[in-house]
C-alpha cells in the first residue's frame, strides 16, 4: 500500500469505530426492549400456568416464560440476516445486495435515450457532410469544365481555332476538358521526356559500341533492414569487377523504377570510379498495367545494340527481345551471378555482333540463361581443343610419319 492509502485508512478509522459503537448500542437497546416488553399472542406463544424463568442480559434481570424465550429467540434469529445486511450497508455501501429496480430501469432508459440522441446527431452530421461534399464537387466540376474547356488564346489575346471550334458551345467545353484529362493521364503514365539520353558522342570522343541498361535493386544491391541500423543497402558479390569489366565494352546506364532521392546517392557510393554514365529513375518509366516499364523507344539509342539486365520481365515487356533475365538476389553472400554475367557480356562485347537481340532471344528461351551459357562455353572449349589437336596432328613432318610407319612394319 502507498503512504496516501495508509493515511486515508488511519484518518477514517475513528469514524468506523464510532459507527460500530452506535450500531452495537442500537442492537442492545432493541434486544432489551424485545426481552422486557415481550408480546403475547394467545395460544401461539405459550401455555397458561407455565412457570416464569429468570434471564440476565447486559446486567438486566427479567422474568420470562419458556414460551417467551422461544419467541424472543425466534425474533432474534429470524432478523439476524437482515440486521447483518443493514450493518454492512451502513459500513460498506458498495456491498449492499439490495438494488433499486426502478432506479436501474430509469437509468437504463436515460442511457438509451442519450444513445439514441447521439446516433441522431451523428446521422445529421453525416448527412451534412455528404451534402457539403456533393455541393463542393459540383462547384469544382463546373469550374474545371469552364477552366479547361475554354479555347486557348494566342499572344494577342485572340481565340485559337481548334478541331472543336465548329461544335456547339457546351460540346466544345466538354471535349476540350476531356482532352485535358487525357493529357494529364499521359503525363503521369508516359516518361517525362522523349529523349531519355543525350545523343551519342561524336569523334574525337569515344562512344562505346553497346549500351548496357541495368536495374539497381536486387541486381546490384539489396535493401536490408535491422533494428540496430535501420535501412541499409548490401552490395552484390562481384559488383565492382562487373562494373569495371563491362565499362570496357558498354555504355552503362542505371534504369530503375525507384525514386531519384534514393538512387542518386546510392550510385555515388556504389560507383566511385564513374563506370555508370547515366541514371534514369521513376519519372523516366512508362506506367502500364500497374508496372513501371522501361520504355527503350525513348532511350535515344539503336536497339540493335542495347542489352537490358533485369530480374523482372514485366519491367521490360515492351522490348522482351532486348532483355536478359538473371535470378533476383536476396542478399546471400555465396552468390556468383555477377561473375558469370561478366563473362557473358565480355564475350558479347568482344564478338562485335551487329544485332544483340538474336543472341538474347536464343538465351531467353531457357529458364537459366547463364547455365546454358556455361554449357555452351564448355562445348565450345571442347570443340576448340579437338580442332587444335587435329591441326597439330596434321602439321607433323611427312618424313617423321614415314619413318614411324617403316619401323612399325
UniProtKB/Swiss-Prot annotation:
GO CC, any one term: mitochondrial inner membrane
Topological domains, Mitochondrial matrix: 43-127
Transmembrane feature ranges: 128-148
Primary location recorded for the protein, binned into one broad class: mitochondrion
Residue ranges with Basic and acidic residues bias: 102-111
First and last residues of the transit peptide: 1-42
Expression sites (tissue/organ): Exclusively expressed in the testis.
Signal peptide residue numbers: none
Keywords, alphabetical: Membrane, Mitochondrion, Mitochondrion inner membrane, Protein transport, Transit peptide, Translocation, Transmembrane, Transmembrane helix, Transport
Domain of life: Eukaryota
Ranges facing Mitochondrial intermembrane side: 149-409
Region called Disordered, residue ranges: 93-114
GO BP annotation list: mitochondrial membrane organization; mitochondrion organization; protein dephosphorylation; protein import into mitochondrial matrix
Gene Ontology molecular-function annotations: protein serine/threonine phosphatase activity; protein tyrosine phosphatase activity; ribonucleoprotein complex binding
Alphabetized Gene3D superfamilies for the sequence: HAD superfamily/HAD-like
Membrane topology: Single-pass membrane protein
Compartments (UniProt record): Mitochondrion inner membrane
Domain FCP1 homology: 205-348
PANTHER family the UniProt entry points to: DULLARD PROTEIN PHOSPHATASE
Family listed: Belongs to the TIM50 family.
Quaternary structure and partners: Component of the TIM23 complex at least composed of Tim23, Tim17 (Tim17a1, Tim17a2 or Tim17b1) and a Tim50.
Biological role: Essential component of the TIM23 complex, a complex that mediates the translocation of transit peptide-containing proteins across the mitochondrial inner membrane.
Name this polypeptide is given: Mitochondrial import inner membrane translocase subunit TIM50-B
Amino acid at each position: 500500500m502507498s503512504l496516501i492509502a495508509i493515511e486515508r485508512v488511519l484518518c477514517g478509522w475513528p469514524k468506523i469505530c464510532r459507527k460500530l459503537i452506535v450500531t452495537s448500542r442500537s442492537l442492545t437497546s432493541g434486544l432489551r426492549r424485545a426481552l422486557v416488553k415481550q408480546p403475547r399472542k394467545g395460544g401461539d406463544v405459550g401455555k397458561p400456568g407455565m412457570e416464569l424463568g429468570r434471564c440476565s442480559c447486559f446486567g438486566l434481570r427479567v422474568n420470562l416464560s419458556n414460551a417467551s424465550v422461544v419467541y424472543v429467540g425466534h425474533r432474534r434469529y429470524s432478523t439476524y440476516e437482515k440486521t447483518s445486511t443493514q450493518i454492512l450497508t451502513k459500513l460498506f455501501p458498495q456491498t449492499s445486495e439490495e438494488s433499486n429496480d426502478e432506479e436501474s430501469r430509469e437509468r437504463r432508459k436515460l442511457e438509451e435515450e442519450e444513445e439514441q440522441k447521439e446516433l441522431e446527431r451523428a446521422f445529421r452530421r453525416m448527412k451534412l457532410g455528404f451534402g457539403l461534399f456533393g455541393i463542393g464537387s459540383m462547384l469544382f466540376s463546373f469550374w474545371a469544365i469552364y477552366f479547361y474547356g475554354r479555347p486557348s488564346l494566342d499572344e494577342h489575346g485572340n481565340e485559337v481555332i481548334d478541331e472543336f471550334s465548329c461544335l456547339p458551345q457546351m460540346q466544345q467545353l466538354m471535349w476540350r476538358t476531356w482532352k485535358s484529362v487525357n493529357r494529364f493521364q499521359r503525363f503521369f503514365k508516359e516518361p517525362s521526356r522523349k529523349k531519355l539520353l543525350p545523343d551519342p558522342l561524336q569523334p574525337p570522343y569515344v562512344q562505346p559500341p553497346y549500351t548496357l541498361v541495368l536495374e539497381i535493386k536486387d541486381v546490384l544491391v539489396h535493401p536490408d533492414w535491422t533494428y540496430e541500423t535501420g535501412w541499409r543497402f548490401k552490395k552484390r558479390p562481384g559488383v565492382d569487377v562487373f562494373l569495371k569489366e563491362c565499362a570496357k565494352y558498354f555504355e552503362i546506364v542505371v534504369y530503375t523504377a525507384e525514386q531519384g532521392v534514393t538512387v542518386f546517392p546510392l550510385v555515388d557510393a556504389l560507383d566511385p570510379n564513374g563506370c555508370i554514365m547515366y541514371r534514369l529513375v521513376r519519372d523516366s518509366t512508362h506506367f502500364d498495367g500497374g508496372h513501371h516499364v522501361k520504355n527503350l523507344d525513348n532511350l535515344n539509342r539503336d536497339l540493335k545494340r542495347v542489352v537490358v539486365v533485369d530480374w523482372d520481365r514485366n519491367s521490360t515487356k515492351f522490348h522482351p527481345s532486348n532483355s536478359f533475365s538473371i535470378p533476383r538476389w536476396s542478399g546471400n553472400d555465396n552468390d556468383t551471378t555477377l561473375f558469370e554475367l561478366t563473362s557473358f557480356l565480355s564475350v558479347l562485347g568482344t564478338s562485335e555482333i551487329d544485332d544483340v537481340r538474336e543472341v538474347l532471344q536464343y538465351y531467353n528461351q531457357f529458364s537459366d540463361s547463364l547455365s546454358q551459357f556455361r554449357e555452351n562455353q564448355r562445348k565450345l572449349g571442347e570443340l576448340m581443343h579437338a580442332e587444335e589437336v587435329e591441326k597439330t596432328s596434321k602439321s607433323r613432318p611427312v618424313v617423321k610419319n614415314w619413318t614411324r610407319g617403316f619401323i612399325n612394319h
